[in-house]
């Protein structure tokens, strides 16, 4: 009989968001007239920018003309898109990133999991706690962990607690670790990292031969000019970091799918024989074998993000969601809750009222206010007693959700 990958059996009962969906669906079936407002999963609600739509429509027409038809594209992405990304997102910020070091993909979630294909099974891996669950679950699937304890912490991972006391920014690990996951602006806490903080991580990684996986999916929400948007703004990062980015939240591509991973050609890791190997070559080989590239139509839409019209429209989308975050943050704070994040970030991290666990308060908000949030414990043991609120929704829904909470859950 065929056998399975037994590491999947170590995963907790359900990925966080499917469990949320199960509870919401059960409630909706029991209360079909309830008007549920979803402020849980970070899916956007506003339409694609007009510049992107126009470019994609033209690209569709290109595909209908023999002279401009495109078949298989380059696995790494079309050069015209990679050049635009390199110039606007990196070079204009002083980052020495070349278009050849950029890999266009269909999602940063995919890339943060797939990147493990090119790394060995004997690496020590560090994650913050709480943390985006994909970082942990993909390592479990790959066989990099032992079993989980009662708190959901997996043996073999190094957990770095982030709390209100440390500003939700992790301290350097006391032990040597090989692979480090960092996400700023952070999901789920909404915390941001200063240049000095990231410099500490870069210095640690270079001193220990570590590699940082830097998730910058929410960098567009940074409005503070003193905060870095990319790990490559930090001296030395080219030799120790891989960066992941996405068009999902800034340009509304959650249903269109386009992202990118930056792998500097100066980044190396050791082979079993002790020789140093270029990570870029391994990732290029992996993508060429397992990935056929993002569609021409979608890449033309992503390219339009960097047009003057696209830049203005993306700025408008980001400002819209940041205003939602401000409303959420201020309303929940006025309701007596301890609130974090929501500044330079689209997520608000909130302490549950005394006596409530994360899931208990999730259920209370769902059943009493018909509002869906994300329980903090789903992001790790240190997330217990918190919940995450997403700013990705319509203004009317955000205001209505806050009104319901204010009226029905006055503390």
UniProtKB/Swiss-Prot annotation:
Pfam families, per database record: Aminotran_1_2
Entry's Gene Ontology molecular function annotations: L,L-diaminopimelate aminotransferase activity; pyridoxal phosphate binding
EC number: 2.6.1.83
Keywords: Aminotransferase, Pyridoxal phosphate, Transferase
SUPFAM superfamilies to which the protein is assigned, alphabetical: PLP-dependent transferases
Domain of life: Bacteria
Reactions catalysed according to its record: (2S,6S)-2,6-diaminopimelate + 2-oxoglutarate = (S)-2,3,4,5-tetrahydrodipicolinate + L-glutamate + H2O + H(+)
Chain positions found as N6-(pyridoxal phosphate)lysine: 249
GO biological process: lysine biosynthetic process via diaminopimelate, diaminopimelate-aminotransferase pathway
Pathway: Amino-acid biosynthesis; L-lysine biosynthesis via DAP pathway; LL-2,6-diaminopimelate from (S)-tetrahydrodipicolinate (aminotransferase route): step 1/1
Binding-site residues, substrate: 15, 42, 109, 132, 187, 292, 388
Binding residue positions for pyridoxal 5'-phosphate: 72, 108-109, 132, 187, 218, 246-248, 257, 292
Cofactor(s) this protein cannot do without: pyridoxal 5'-phosphate
UniProt xrefs under InterPro entries: Aminotransferase_I/II_large, DapL/ALD1, PyrdxlP-dep_Trfase, PyrdxlP-dep_Trfase_major, PyrdxlP-dep_Trfase_small
Family: Belongs to the class-I pyridoxal-phosphate-dependent aminotransferase family. LL-diaminopimelate aminotransferase subfamily.
Function summary: Involved in the synthesis of meso-diaminopimelate (m-DAP or DL-DAP), required for both lysine and peptidoglycan biosynthesis. Catalyzes the direct conversion of tetrahydrodipicolinate to LL-diaminopimelate.
Subunit structure: Homodimer.
UniProt protein name: LL-diaminopimelate aminotransferase
Organism of derivation: Cyanothece sp. (strain PCC 7425 / ATCC 29141)
Gene symbol of the encoding locus: dapL
């Amino acid at each position: 009989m065929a056998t399975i990958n037994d590491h999947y059996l170590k995963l907790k009962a359900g990925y966080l968001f499917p469990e949320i969906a199960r509870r919401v669906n059960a409630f909706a079936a029991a209360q079909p007239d309830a008007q549920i407002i979803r402020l849980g999963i970070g899916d956007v609600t506003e339409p694609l920018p007009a510049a992107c739509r126009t470019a994609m429509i033209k690209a569709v027409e290109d595909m209908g003309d023999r002279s401009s038809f495109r078949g298989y594209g380059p696995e790494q992405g079309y050069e015209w898109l990679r050049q635009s990304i390199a110039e606007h997102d990196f070079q204009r910020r002083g980052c020495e990133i070349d278009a050849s070091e950029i890999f266009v993909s269909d999602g940063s979630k995919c890339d943060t999991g797939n990147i493990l294909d090119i790394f060995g099974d004997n690496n020590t891996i560090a994650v913050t706690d709480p943390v985006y669950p994909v970082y942990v679950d993909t390592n479990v699937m790959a066989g990099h962990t032992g079993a989980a304890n009662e708190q959901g912490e997996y043996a073999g991972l190094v957990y770095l607690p982030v709390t209100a006391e440390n500003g939700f920014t992790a301290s350097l690990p006391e032990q040597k670790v090989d692979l480090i996951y960092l996400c700023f602006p952070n999901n789920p806490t909404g915390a941001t990292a200063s240049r000095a903080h990231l410099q500490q991580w870069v210095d640690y990684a270079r001193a220990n031969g570590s590699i940082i996986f830097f998730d910058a999916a929410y960098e567009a929400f940074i409005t503070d000019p003193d905060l870095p948007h990319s790990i490559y703004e930090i001296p030395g990062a080219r030799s120790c970091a891989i960066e992941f980015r996405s068009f999902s939240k800034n340009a509304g591509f959650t249903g269109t799918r386009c992202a990118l991973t930056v792998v500097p050609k100066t980044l190396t890791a050791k082979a079993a024989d002790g020789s140093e190997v270029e990570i870029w070559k391994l990732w290029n080989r992996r993508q060429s074998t397992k990935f056929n590239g993002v569609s021409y139509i979608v890449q033309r839409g992503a390219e339009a993000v960097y047009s003057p019209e696209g830049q203005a429209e993306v700025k408008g989308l980001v400002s819209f969601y940041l205003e939602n975050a401000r409303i959420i943050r201020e309303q929940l704070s006025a309701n007596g809750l301890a609130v974090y994040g929501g500044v330079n970030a689209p997520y608000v991290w909130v302490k549950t009222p005394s006596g409530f666990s994360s899931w208990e308060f999730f259920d209370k908000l769902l059943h009493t206010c018909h509002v869906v949030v994300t329980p903090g414990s789903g992001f790790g043991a240190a997330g217990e007693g918190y919940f995450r609120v997403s700013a990705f929704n319509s203004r009317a829904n955000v205001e209505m959700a806050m009104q319901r909470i204010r009226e029905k859950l006055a503390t």
